[in-house]
């Protein structure tokens, strides 16, 4: 077993963490220096300027003391405002330096909650003064760059409980205006979006208008795939609304979902379902469709249930997918399977795994059983069914059977259908590996109108012994002629792969220039990502990295380098990935914050996957190195890095792995306390409770009570 425990041999990597002490921090903003640094009028004392973090810690301490004294909200709030003014006017603390701090998050949330409690009639302290409203307090936080997601959430909830949806919508607009000035918090943003969605449902009810997903997505400024549907239902149930209001909102939410499912089926299937990989969301939406859309699946051609079947199968839930047929029958006695649904079932069974020597035969038998029993027996086989059969055979890996089916079973008039012939040709060019170009040439159509097919042909040519001239000729004819197809990122990546073989070492040449891109083009990063997906070996990846000669100080360098980090870590070459990371850190020694979340996420995720696939706890020690470095550079750990670390520890704990004393110390005294801190700040929500459940199986790991 490979062990990667930190040792003297690897001290250069450990040095990444210790080196951070010597890395100069970002230059302090000089806006408050010079002419802005004021001295008091003649005869008064000069005030000493203090650091923003010191100022915020002072505010936090004062607020905490006021809460311990059980002072009323109005008194605490007034003193808080006075203290802020003093910091700004006398000690010259610029509020814009508060933007990225989380020091006061929890105590500021407590002030809003106390004002809410007092307004609800719960007397606190000795004063009977009228407390400030939560919104009034939030406005002050916004003024001084202290507002965070959790503060918006508290006020939004209060507006909804008070049945003030218009005020909630106005607050959402304010949130959008200030979101870029707050630390990144995807969990908090999702919750704010969910609460805003509830406000929209309330307004729809008030105006007697049917809720519409298109209107909601315009309001939230996101695509339907980003709407937090799960959170919306959970928030409706947990807000503490009256039973009547809650039931009305749940009914409106059901109407919203049904409208989304059925108003524009093509958009739901092609723009959302085919592009989403969120298994939890898709499973939830299927259950909702089954509950709400009886009329749709008993009167239509059932394209939506079929699309759910295929998507679940693609997400490795093929057994759940085939159960959909039974669920539909149980949901309504009026349900009768359509040919369209059987076409989807064909593709679904192709995803079901099979094992043993007869695995391929088993897969083929399943497909043929559906074809013969439900489609061929109907006597009228449509183009859609031939298409589904071809795709099912390709999914199952029966490339030779595709050839025989095409030759013996597909009628000539169907073969003439461009959609069908494109599928057949894609199968042919995708299945051939490193053959002579002469074997491909006769199959290449004179005109290609399908982008996916064109890319498949181009890649097959690159893998063959086709000359540079042959490849350039096909590329020019297919993509650069007046009637040509517009190339996508994958097209450019394949052409880049072809050009790389003939690329010289001249510093005057640019490898990206050979495909018409500049080094700083936004498309360049996407093309590099696609290149690494089609890259057949590490030598090609390294050749591209060398040819790119990435400037690690450029604006988009982190995106590019993180793609290579992902690639090398996925292929097990973590040593080279660390070399790239260390070089990036060295090149940015004067601005270490340039080593951003993308790079750290890549390292944490890569080590997480390696720890699991190799069952080696030593990679947790690697995560510790980057945890310490990230903390020193950014004063925080990015959420994805936290998740990757928890995933490692969870999987290894489930396998009864033995952690070293150093690793246990890291888990118990660094990772878990940090998770508690995030929970208190409401800046992170652990979506998979199994992580902690698995960790509990190790009696040397102590889960804090706050996380149980």
From Swiss-Prot:
Q: Where is the composition biased (Polar residues)?
A: 19-36
Location of the transit peptide in the chain: 1-15
Gene3D superfamilies from the entry?
Tetratricopeptide repeat domain
GO BP annotations of the record are: DNA recombination; meiotic cell cycle
The compartments listed are: Mitochondrion
Q: Name one GO cellular component term.
A: mitochondrion
- InterPro entries, sorted: TPR-like_helical_dom_sf
**Disordered: where is this region?**
19-44
At the top level, the lineage of the source is Eukaryota
Keywords assigned by UniProt, alphabetized: DNA recombination, Meiosis, Mitochondrion, Transit peptide
Coiled coil (residue ranges) = none
Query: What start and end residues bound the annotated signal peptide?
Result: none
What the protein does comes down to:
May be involved in the control of meiotic sister-chromatid recombination.
Q: What protein does this entry describe?
A: Meiotic sister-chromatid recombination protein 6, mitochondrial
To which species is this protein native?
Answer: Kluyveromyces lactis (strain ATCC 8585 / CBS 2359 / DSM 70799 / NBRC 1267 / NRRL Y-1140 / WM37)
Q: What is the lineage of its organism?
A: Eukaryota, Fungi, Dikarya, Ascomycota, Saccharomycotina
